[in-house]
Amino acid sequence: MITRLNIASIYVLDKDEALDFYVNKLGLEKGNDVRQGDYRWLTIRVPGGPGTEVSLEQPGLPLHDEATAAQLRELITKGALGGLVFNTDDAQGLYETLKERGVTDFTQEPTEHFYGTDMGLRDPFGNPIRILQQGKAG
């Protein structure tokens, strides 16, 4: 029986730039940062606990040949490889904080829906990110 999701992955074009964005702009924390030969295992996570980590993967060796890496880089910049959804207790407050931290690529300001308030943005590479303040069940 599966008991929880441990690690999910997203592709980025530069791991250091991604780490800076996710930690210093979004407020996440670095999880693992381990090098093994040419490979760098780098994860981020929501602060405060042993929850699901997000592995920041970069196209290229040793995981991909150059042709595959080139295709992945093109898909990343189109925002076509999936994305992330985070929860917050205060979507509007977080939106203001993100703007103060220099986040500019918002795809949607905080908007109320029947399920709660959410907003959209993209990381520096084009990956879509949704942030949801869930509404009351009813």
Segments (PLM) and residue ranges:
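Vicinal oxygen chelate
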Residues: 1-7, 29-86, 93-124, 133-138
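Short Gly/charged-rich anion-binding patches and loops
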Residues: 17-18, 93
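Conserved active-site tyrosine of GNAT-family acetyltransferases
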Residues: 18-23, 98, 126
